[in-house]
Each structure stands twice: as structure tokens, then as C-alpha cells.
Amino acid sequence: SAHADMFAAYTPRSNPKSVGAGDGYVGREVLLKLYNITHSRVENPEISVCAVEYQNVGGISNQDLETQQSLNGEVKKDIVHIKGTNQSPMLEAQLDVQMMSQVAENADVWMWSGTQWLYSFAVDFLNTTDIPDVLSMSWGWSARDQCSSGLGTCPGNMTSSQYLHRVNMEYVKMGLRGVTVAVSSGDAGAPGRTN
């Protein structure tokens, strides 16, 4: 499987950047140690990871990505697969692609910017031939408020519960295509903001 090849042998850098304890910097070495990532360099050039952004607000800067890669002793590798519109750089999207680059060095990093929300992204994704191996979504919203203002009305005036069920079915289809879908637990942790 493509995912088994994702993290082949990790080779520690011969000249890691030296920073002092307590100086506030968190470099790649800290993340790898903190999360016990022992194989972070992708050897298979076909492996791809993708930051998914919504509501047409995601944007990245390849220059910022290259700076991050250089400061962390990584090989510079631009994002060439951008689906949708790359708006001006946004902090969340920048963080997403930079973290992917750090924990999966040398992977083909994508950015996918959808104009709407979960369901429309899923339909667009499932109707696309050339897709990434791994999706990472760091967006979230209360389950009971999926059809509330700010997100737009749900298709066919569904309730939030119906919408979630439909979205879940579409994401199962992504898994059946062999795509790994990783979703953050949110800024407030797994229980969310509204429990």
C-alpha cells in the first residue's frame, strides 16, 4: 500500500539548527521527538498529503514554505498541486502545509481550497481523478450547528443531523478509494466547544 511506504527510514540531520532551551523556538526535531515520529522522510515520490481548506479562504505561500523547510534542514519542495483558488496566505493553511512538510518530509504536499463546506468538498473530491493519498482537515464546527448561518444552508434544507449523516457517507467513500482522512479534534479538544 502507498501509505506503508510513507515513512521509510528517517535520517537525522547532520547539522541541525542549534537553539537554546527556553528560547521559545520549536523546530522540527522537537515535533519529531514529542510525537515519537521515527520515520519522517518519505522515500516514495508518489506519496501525497493534502491540506483541505473551506469557504474559499485558504491560501499558502511557497516562499514561506521554503523558508520553513530551509530553517528545519529539509529539502525545499514547493506545492505544485493547488486545487481551487489560492487566496492570500492564511495562518491556518500555512500551518497545515508546513506541519505536513515537517512530519512527512519529501511528500508531495497539496492544498485544496473549496468554496463551500464539507459535503460540497466531498462531492468535488469524489468526482476528481487525480487525488492525494492523505487528506488533513483542521476545520470544525459544532455538529448541531452544521446548517447554521456562517456555513450556509444545507443542501435540500436538511437538518444538521441529516447533513452530518450524508457527509459521513461521502467520507466513507473517500476511505473506500484508499484515501486516509485525518481530522483535527479542534482547538478545544475532542469534546469540542459545545459538548
List each model region and its residues.
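Substrate-binding/charge-relay-adjacent region of secreted/lumenal peptidase catalytic domains
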Residues: 1-195
